Design a protein with these regions (language model features):
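Short beta-to-alpha linker loops that shape the active-site pocket of alpha/beta-hydrolase fold enzymes
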Residues: 66-70, 152, 243
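C-terminal catalytic histidine-bearing segment of alpha/beta-hydrolase fold enzymes
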Residues: 73, 218, 222, 226-265
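Acidic beta-to-alpha connecting loop that harbors the catalytic carboxylate
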Residues: 41, 207-209, 242-244
Length: 265
């Protein structure tokens, strides 16, 4: 992807307890727009660096961080994270989504204060990272645009199939009180009024994605249309034929779509 601006070096810092990575246009531009980009389950902030470079080249202060229990904040190898989470999805996934959403608030605060980024924020991510970005838009009015790839606003993920065995529907398990708190406060589909201000949200979905089915995004848009029709008009759900979950995770074309969505600001 061609860069409009020269890009500085990759920088890292601990923001409180949160390991952050960022890139900026070089030289730094005052009030450059802030872009937050988040990684999928079991990955790390380093996986976001190639797209951070593209975002910085497009003029954004581009930031990512390790999700809760991931990267520098984790103690498990990738396969163990996946095994634990999909062995008890609601008990383990909901706190990861919730804590990471709250951490995103802190990172946005830091980036605006310390990097002098604009308070008009765009946010996005892949799979779990996209889930978090959508949730963040429901609690942070600075987030004006969201772009998500193979992600969902429905944390219950009905019809979620095993990535390794698409014929198998994954059991959700039960949430404990701790996990339930995050769902009760942050799940986008059950907090539609949090989106009444009308952030522009793009869902890039795969028609063949049985792990994060596109109907979650479609139901979110339909539910918004019933109570906030003007808001639903700012939600764009694109279902790409022949694209499965892992196809979407790896897709350069979908990243380009997200970039175009951000640049419409």
């Amino acid at each position: 992807m061609a860069s409009q601006y020269p890009v500085g070096e990759v920088s890292t810092v601990l923001v409180d307890h949160i390991p952050v990575v960022w890139m900026e246009p070089s030289p730094r531009r005052p009030e450059a727009p802030l872009a937050l980009w988040l990684h999928p389950l079991s990955r790390t902030k380093e996986d976001a660096i190639p797209f951070l470079q593209d975002l910085a080249g497009a003029g954004f202060v581009a930031v990512s961080f390790d999700a809760w229990q991931h990267g520098q904040r984790g103690t498990e190898v990738r396969d163990h994270i996946l095994e634990r989470v999909f062995g008890g999805f609601r008990r383990h996934m909901w706190p990861i989504l919730g804590q990471t959403t709250l951490d995103a608030l802190r990172v946005v605060d830091w980036a605006i204060a310390e990097l002098e980024a604009s308070p008009e924020v765009v946010a996005g991510g892949v799979s779990m990272g996209g889930d978090v970005a959508v949730a963040l838009a429901g609690v942070d009015e600075r987030v004006m645009r969201v772009a998500s790839i193979v992600a969902t606003p429905d944390w219950t993920r009905p019809g979620m199939h095993d990535l390794n065995d698409p014929s198998r529907v994954l059991p959700q398990g039960q949430a404990d009180a701790y996990a339930r708190w995050f769902y009760d406060h942050l799940d986008p589909l059950t907090h539609l009024d949090a989106y009444a201000r009308g952030p522009a949200i793009a869902f890039e979905c795969g028609a063949d994605d049985t792990h994060v089915p596109p109907d979650g995004a479609q139901r979110f848009q339909a539910a918004l249309s019933e109570i906030h029709p003007h808001v639903a008009e700012r939600v764009c759900v694109t279902v790409h034929p022949g694209v499965g979950h892992l196809d979407g995770v790896r897709s350069a074309a979908l990243l380009q779509n997200c970039m175009a969505w951000f640049l419409e600001r």
